Amino acid sequence: MHRLTLPAPAKLNLWLHIIGRRPDGYHELETVFQFLDHGDELTFALREDGAIRLHTEIEAVPHDSNLIVRAARRLQEQSGTGLGADIWLTKVLPMGGGIGGGSSDAATTLLALAHLWQLDWDEDRLAALGLTLGADVPVFVRGHAAFAQGVGEQLTPVDPAEPWYVVLVPQVSVSTVEIFSHPQLTRDSLPLKMRPVPEGNSRNDCQPVVEQSYPEVRNALNSLGKFTEARLTGTGSCVFGAFPSKAEADKVLALLSATQTGFVAKGSNVSMLHRKLQSLVKKSSA
């Protein structure tokens, strides 16, 4: 195989509690990640000369510091391969939205190139490499909804309900550094002691600070909150609400379309990236 096209799915933080701050400045978190059947798309083509070339219309991030390029080069260095790749990115997910666009792109890159370069790397090794690129990368490498602890890298698989979601995308990029350094951020939520993880009595501890700093996000939460419980995902700008059917979610998004931008997507406990990879493995072994 010399060419491969794979999705890079979005994720939601169904809730996010900050339970402390470490001596190195990073925050201790508890959160639940769930995937959406919606995301970017990447195409990879094998190069024999070892070069990594990213082709995209997005110019906000310099080529060499783009997380896709960094992931490819890190895997190249660690594996010792002499192969390279051309990578085409079709960008759908917003930057700074809190739905994992950059981390998901990096994870798809690691999994795709491990397949394309025929590396004998298992998921554990790829997830460990992913962690060096960002705390959210391992959950995309693993591909299963998870209860996350630590800085988000300690993952326990979970299977929450898989509703349809309306996700609103305010036209603003939220700075994670700004939010986590905000003096009014809650940093002392009590760690959960119940298993399985309770869905009730949860929240996003970053939401009050983001609402205060970004009126566009506050307006989106208020708009969606007229129809269902609306919540911020991660430390980004996107807000979401759950609905029992696609028809109901589509109706709500249509009602909000005059003032809000967004999309409807199905929640999924197994990412569409992993479903696609599993189908490729089945085809190759058939």
UniProtKB/Swiss-Prot annotation:
The active site is at 11, 136. It is an enzyme of class 2 (transferase). Its EC number is 2.7.1.148. It catalyses: 4-CDP-2-C-methyl-D-erythritol + ATP = 4-CDP-2-C-methyl-D-erythritol 2-phosphate + ADP + H(+). It comes from the Bacteria. SUPFAM superfamilies: GHMP Kinase, C-terminal domain, Ribosomal protein S5 domain 2-like. Pfam families: GHMP_kinases_C, GHMP_kinases_N. The keyword Transmembrane helix does not apply. Pathway: Isoprenoid biosynthesis; isopentenyl diphosphate biosynthesis via DXP pathway; isopentenyl diphosphate from 1-deoxy-D-xylulose 5-phosphate: step 3/6. GO terms for biological process: isopentenyl diphosphate biosynthetic process, methylerythritol 4-phosphate pathway; terpenoid biosynthetic process. One of its GO terms (molecular function) is 4-(cytidine 5'-diphospho)-2-C-methyl-D-erythritol kinase activity. InterPro entries: GHMP_kinase_C_dom, GHMP_kinase_C_sf, GHMP_kinase_N_dom, IspE, Ribosomal_Su5_D2-typ_SF, Ribsml_uS5_D2-typ_fold_subgr. NCBIfam families: ispE. Catalyzes the phosphorylation of the position 2 hydroxy group of 4-diphosphocytidyl-2C-methyl-D-erythritol. Belongs to the GHMP kinase family. IspE subfamily. This is 4-diphosphocytidyl-2-C-methyl-D-erythritol kinase. It comes from Pseudomonas putida (strain W619). The lineage of its organism: Bacteria, Pseudomonadati, Pseudomonadota, Gammaproteobacteria, Pseudomonadales.
